[in-house]
Amino acid sequence: MKQIIKKGSFLTLMFLLLGCLSLYAADNGLITKQITIELEKAGTLPDRITSIKKYEITNLKIIGEINGTDLRMIREMAGRDYISNSTDGKLSVLDLSKAKIVEGGVCYYYDCYTSNDVIGDRAFAGCSGLTSLTLPAGITKIGDDAFGGCSGLTSLTLPAGITEIDDGAFWYCSGLTSLNLPAGITYIGWYAFEGCSGLTSLTLPAGITRISRGAFIDCSGLTSLTLPAGITEIEPWAFIGCSGLTSLTLPAGITKIGSDAFRGCSGLTNLTLPAGITEIGYSAFYGCSGLTSLTLPAGITWIGGEAFRGCSGLTSIYVYAEKVPIIGSNAFTGVDAKKCTVYVPMGTYNDYWLSDFGYYFENIVEFDATGIDKTTTSTDVEEVARYSVNGQRLSAPTKGLNIVKYSDGSVKKVAVR
């Protein structure tokens, strides 16, 4: 009888233990419930988790100071060791909101070591299994390639104190669909968001003064982008392959657009360049096949080679420059010479016709570059011809912009409502 009771008690105990474990472990043995570990001293995380359990935890929260030793352990749990070899780690969700990164410990990635309040270079590089990450509140900087290749990351919370995002910081984080950039950020490095094809919208902080080289290459999902007023330069390759962009408002202070800056942005339909623009770089808008209308400001002096090559959808170009800009080779190759009409300031027709504009375009029309007239009230002149913005002859006023030629030889751009 005693043996039967003992056996029954043992089975009951085992049942209770298995029931408790089921709260933490999934069918595949992974621990899905958040595990919270509070560290009394930096560098002690490896002492708190056994070598077996570290590969079973999928959701981890750390409280306290962490250094390079701890970060190396976290990387192993997230699928990559310190020399970027893959591990059996399955960590998916990481909450460091109550943690503080401090200097010290061993290297976490080759020769990379932790610094106080910095997400260091390549801190989470290659950890593609991470899906959600909350950073420590005190972080001020995100280093080079810090999240490079974290393609599974869909949720990332950046603390308010960050002022700098370095080169390649979010390189190919293709799973990110949105990201709130703190207002205090003043620098975004080269290729910082290259390959973030999942991003659909992004608002850059007011302190940003330039778009760095290659910062948004192949962000093909980006449909909306808000650029701060303080930006003065868009560097080369900044938005190559951002085919989802349909419209873009460039800040008034921009003076230069770098080479290949918007190459392959085939979704853009119209573009007005700010008055301060003087130079358009080589291949800046190459392959923007969706572009139908282009406005070049009065101060434009140079249009780089192949700048608008392949912009096959262009039907109208308004040039406000009294002095004909210098045009590089093949600047408008691929634009339909018959379909596209170039509108130039009054009195400059001959200059433009004799220039490279006359080589690329058959239809050059003078217009009043001083502004848009809503109506024509003068009784001294009569309308003799009317055209649409793409150069087609109109028999009557048509809603939208009309190009009207008068008996005194003047041409005006008229808005018809």
Identify the meaning behind each predicted range.
Residues 32-40, 58-66, 84-118, 128-141, ...:
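Structural signature of tandem-repeat unit edges
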Residues 11-22:
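Bacterial N-terminal signal peptides
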Residues 367-390:
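Residue-level detector of functionally pivotal "anchor" positions at catalytic/ligand-binding pockets or at interdomain
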Residues 401-417:
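C-terminal tail/sorting-segment detector
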